[in-house]
Amino acid sequence: VVGGDECNINEHRFL
């Protein structure tokens, strides 16, 4: 899912 910069940071944190 793509949401924006915040989503990118969240995904990186999850990874």
Swiss-Prot record:
This is Snake venom serine protease. GO terms for molecular function: serine-type peptidase activity; toxin activity. One of its GO terms (cellular component) is extracellular region. Belongs to the peptidase S1 family. Snake venom subfamily. It comes from the Eukaryota. Snake venom serine protease that may act in the hemostasis system of the prey. Its EC number is 3.4.21.-. It is found in: Secreted. Glycosylated.
